[in-house]
């Protein structure tokens, strides 16, 4: 949808410390301001009320934030609240106002949540979705915000507090309430606590305050007095008991001895421009001063690691290295794990925001004596979970740079404590949380079979000590959630390898994370339709009805597979027939309409396959953009109704069945593709000057076009024209950095990588697309084709088969047969033979072809048609799906993406013209123009198979383009 206007509400920026704060300052990056975005709003949506309820016990804070938004506009809106959280904060709950009552959200896989939200919002009912985006950024989507009405939402945030001085430091997340017309604070701390200054003083453990958002200070922080002694709590919850041990430990002020050679992994990707280089250099100044003399092995990380360079450090002087870092221009995607460890390097510093957008997710193997420290200055845009998981699993720590560089240096130069745990039987999944280690605390989490299991701990090579006696807690959900949060942190060291485990954990404990979101639906029918188990009152009825639904679904799956097998048999009948290769007879009377009937093959298989049709009239010319969508739809409906009603009566049989398969064409088949070059104003400007300086000219233009995907596509094409492939791939990879949650952009990136003959790079991109949304069969097909092209045919079978067997929305009808063509071709041509035991044997016959053309495109809600004109002058298209000589066109895709396929088993000699007819798009395009991808194949399914692929970007209007030609001699 194209919006004419977008209003945003700035809720608050955390910019200062309050005068009444009574605790030492703890330096940690502050969150930036939340934004409420209401597209198409003429007046800004108002935050009417905010209620913040906070409670602290044993160093753990839980805050419940209830917000009421009012829409003063005369139209229904969708609202999107974007907000960051500080490092260590975790969302543990979300609720949405449904018919006046707050209904708790339930966890769902992230891609599933997005799919369900968008489908339900299109029906105009009440979903709410909370998801994590980049780093520690979150997005809450609410629909509808009624015209002239209000909606309430509630967030629950949990965090372990930092210890400083003589107590726990509690900072209230006021940023959510600052813009509210009315605010209420209700806080509870241990009963003996008194802290802070009026009017925000906690007395006897309580604080109640009412007022306006404008009266709130920029930040409220209290120091809650607490004894520095070990405390152990155990509580039951669901499947077991959960333990939290808070252990004071000694910290050393003596810096550790640095090795004489260190490795510096410097993130030079496009997102590096948002880091604070001044803070990073200030930290490195002190680090190299402590190092004195030594060597630095520098590796700049982008879409691929640049060649390593070595620099000498003399008496702390690192000016040469500093100049090299200053010369790094941010560009390309972030392949943070794609580098080679050097045996001589004993310590690595990774300076990055942790937002891995490219390549593998598991770090290279480090030797036991090699450490990794991670450093970020990107604030809330940091993926602190990943960086902490990587560094702590490799003997180092994560340092989030704040305003106090001396504190950050002390943390970087101190040695992480060696902590060992001796757990008895019945103790599972012990996790050590080191986030407060610099303040002299360790938090130990574990899952227990019972509450009396003994455990011992040894810190820093000291004596083994038994944990103190446990205190029984009544808040099992809180302790279990903290354990799950720490366990997720541990698994994040290999996020891709542990994705399923992380998703199960997040769903079990209701945590929002990289792969799990929280969703609220309006009706029980919605929960049943999407197989999402609700919370609260709806759960019992859901469980009873869902058991019946499961049995029905299994029967429907079997029926669907039978239907696909029947349609595949019909295609075999078409393939086994011989078709005339002479000049077609002149059409007489109304028989001309037969070839134009827009009927599906499966509706009249035998008659259709037995009868080659006369030559069809020319396909209609493209319509004007202003009329195209409505007229295309109605014209197709009229054409289908009038022609298909007559089809069976008017067919004259001129072809015959053959007992043996017809022979494929043995002659020469050539392909000639139409040339295409980017012709934007920027592309024309960049072409001027020497080719050797093209990349430099691009860098000079980059900042001005950083939000334009079309810019990066144009530049990549120009670099490929000049033979600068590696730089072209770098520029192309910027699409992965632009919008981390935009699968449409990633799909375009994957297609362009395939066109550039880089399928190994395309595979992880298409894996990301699939992880973001499994509701579109193209996501499975794209991954399967990329795996096959990357030399992984066995792995390619699974996603291709999913296209065949899964139920899809009706707008994707026909894609199953196209994927089956690709799957059976892969099986037939692979050596050694593939394992096909999981595939229905009815679906395994391969059908080689002389000619195959497949058209797909990168925009949803857009219509494009494949036209193939043969030597008879007959055009195969959506209205003429079966030609006189047996050319077959697949079903028409009018809703987006495609694919559409033309197949011809035995090609008549002559020229075949391939065109794409674009009807236009009904949505705002991520690249500013629709991109078509057309694959032309000769001798499909044989040893002589030859593929060529062309990509073109079309203007956002109706047009017909010549893509290429086949010639059969």
Where are these regions (language model features)?
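Intrinsic-disorder/low-complexity signal
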Residues: 829-969
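Alpha-solenoid helical repeat scaffolds
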Residues: 710-714, 744-748, 778-782, 798, ...
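An acidic, Ser/Thr-enriched
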Residues: 93-99, 103-133, 137, 141-265, ...
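N-terminal, polar/Ser/Thr-rich
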Residues: 21-58
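Von Willebrand factor
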Residues: 257-351, 356, 381-383
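VWA/integrin I-like adhesion module and closely mimicked acidic/polar interface patches used
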Residues: 352-401, 409-412
């Amino acid at each position: 949808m194209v919006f004419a206007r977008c209003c945003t509400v700035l809720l608050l920026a955390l910019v200062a410390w309050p005068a009444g704060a009574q605790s030492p300052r703890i330096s940690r990056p502050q969150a930036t301001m939340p934004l409420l975005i209401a597209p198409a709003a003429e007046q800004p949506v108002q935050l009417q009320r905010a209620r913040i309820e906070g409670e602290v016990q044993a160093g753990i804070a839980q805050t419940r934030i209830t917000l009421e938004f009012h829409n003063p506009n005369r139209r229904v809106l969708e609202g999107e609240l974007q907000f960051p959280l500080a490092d260590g904060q975790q969302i543990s709950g979300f609720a949405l106002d449904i018919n006046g009552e707050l209904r708790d959200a339930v966890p769902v896989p992230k891609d599933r949540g997005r799919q369900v939200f968008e489908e339900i919002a299109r029906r105009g009912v009440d979903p709410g979705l909370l998801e994590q985006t980049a780093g520690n950024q979150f997005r809450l989507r609410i629909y509808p915000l009624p015209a002239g009405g209000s909606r309430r939402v509630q967030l629950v945030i949990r965090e372990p507090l930092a210890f400083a001085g003589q107590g726990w430091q509690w900072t209230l997340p006021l940023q959510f309430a600052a813009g509210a017309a009315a605010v209420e604070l209700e806080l509870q701390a241990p009963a003996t606590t008194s802290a802070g200054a009026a009017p925000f003083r906690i007395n006897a453990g309580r604080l109640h305050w009412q007022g306006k958002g404008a009266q709130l200070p920029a930040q409220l922080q209290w120091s809650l007095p607490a004894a520095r002694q070990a405390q152990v709590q155990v509580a039951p919850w669901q499947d077991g008991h959960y333990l939290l041990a808070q252990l004071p430990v000694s910290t050393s002020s003596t810096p550790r001895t640095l090795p004489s050679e260190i490795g510096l992994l410097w993130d030079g990707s496009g997102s590096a421009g948002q880091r604070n280089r001044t803070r990073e250099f200030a930290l490195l100044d002190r680090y190299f001063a402590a190092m004195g003399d030594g060597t630095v092995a520098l590796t700049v990380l982008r879409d691929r690691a640049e060649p390593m360079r070595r620099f000498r450090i003399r008496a702390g002087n690192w000016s040469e290295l500093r100049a090299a870092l200053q010369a790094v221009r941010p560009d390309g995607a972030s392949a943070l794990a794609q580098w080679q460890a050097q045996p001589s390097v004993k310590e690595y510093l990774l300076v990055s925001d942790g937002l891995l957008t490219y390549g593998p997710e598991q770090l290279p193997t480090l030797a036991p004596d090699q450490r990794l420290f991670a450093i970020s200055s990107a604030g809330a845009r940091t993926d602190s979970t990943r960086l902490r998981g990587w560094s702590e699993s490799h003997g180092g720590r994560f340092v989030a740079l704040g305003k106090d560089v001396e504190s950050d240096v002390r943390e970087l130069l101190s040695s992480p404590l060696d902590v060992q745990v001796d757990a008895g039987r019945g103790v599972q999944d012990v996790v050590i949380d080191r986030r407060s280690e610099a303040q002299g605390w360790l938090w130990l989490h574990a899952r227990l079979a019972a509450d009396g299991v003994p455990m011992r701990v040894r810190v820093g090579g000291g004596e083994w000590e038994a944990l103190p006696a446990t205190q029984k807690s009544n808040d099992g959900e809180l302790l279990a959630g903290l354990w799950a949060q720490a366990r997720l942190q541990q698994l994040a060291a290999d996020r891709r390898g542990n994705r399923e485990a992380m998703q199960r954990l997040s769903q079990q404990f209701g945590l929002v994370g990289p792969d799990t979101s929280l969703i609220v639906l309006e009706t029980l029918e919605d929960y049943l339709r999407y197989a999402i188990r609700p919370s609260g009152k709806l759960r019992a009825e859901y469980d009873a009805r869902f058991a019946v639904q499961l049995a029905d679904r299994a029967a429907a799956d079997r029926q669907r597979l039978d239907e696909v097998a029947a349609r595949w048999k019909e295609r075999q009948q078409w393939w086994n027939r011989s078709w005339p290769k002479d000049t077609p007879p002149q059409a007489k009377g109304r028989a001309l309409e037969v070839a134009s009937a827009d009927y599906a093959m499966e509706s009249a298989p035998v008659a259709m396959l037995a009868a080659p049709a006369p030559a069809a009239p020319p396909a209609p010319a493209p319509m004007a953009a202003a009329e195209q969508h409505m007229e295309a739809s109605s014209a197709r409906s009229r054409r289908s109704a009038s022609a298909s009603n007559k089809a069976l009566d008017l067919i004259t049989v001129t072809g015959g069945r053959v007992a043996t398969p017809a022979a494929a064409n043995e002659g020469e088949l050539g392909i000639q593709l139409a040339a295409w070059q980017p012709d934007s104003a920027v592309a024309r400007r960049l072409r001027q000057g020497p080719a050797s300086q093209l990349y430099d000219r691009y860098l000079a233009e980059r900042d001005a076009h950083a939000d334009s995907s079309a810019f990066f596509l144009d530049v990549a094409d120009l670099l490929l024209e000049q033979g600068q492939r590696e730089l072209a791939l770098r520029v192309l990879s910027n699409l992965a950095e632009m919008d981390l949650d935009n699968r449409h952009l990633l799909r375009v990136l994957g297609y362009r990588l395939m066109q550039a003959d880089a399928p190994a790079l395309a595979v992880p991109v298409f894996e990301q697309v699939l992880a973001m949304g499994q509701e579109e069969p193209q996501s499975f097909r794209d991954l399967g084709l990329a795996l096959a092209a990357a030399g992984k045919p066995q792995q390619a079978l699974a996603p291709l088969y999913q296209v065949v067997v899964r139920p899809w929305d009706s707008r994707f009808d026909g894609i199953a047969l196209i994927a089956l063509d690709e799957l059976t071709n892969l099986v037939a041509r692979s050596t050694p033979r593939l394992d096909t035991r999981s595939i229905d044997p009815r679906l395994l016959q391969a059908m080689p072809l002389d000619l195959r053309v497949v058209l797909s495109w990168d925009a949803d809600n857009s219509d494009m048609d494949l036209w193939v004109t043969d030597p008879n002058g007959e055009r195969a298209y959506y209205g003429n799906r079966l030609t006189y000589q047996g050319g077959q066109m697949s079903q028409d895709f009018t809703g987006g993406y495609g694919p559409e396929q033309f197949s011809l088993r035995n090609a008549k000699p002559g020229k075949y013209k391939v065109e794409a007819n674009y009807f236009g798009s009904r949505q705002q395009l991520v690249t500013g123009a629709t991109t078509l991808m057309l694959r032309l194949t000769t001798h499909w399914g044989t040893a002589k198979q030859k593929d060529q692929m062309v990509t073109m970007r079309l203007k956002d209007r109706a047009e017909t383009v010549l893509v290429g030609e086949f010639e059969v001699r």
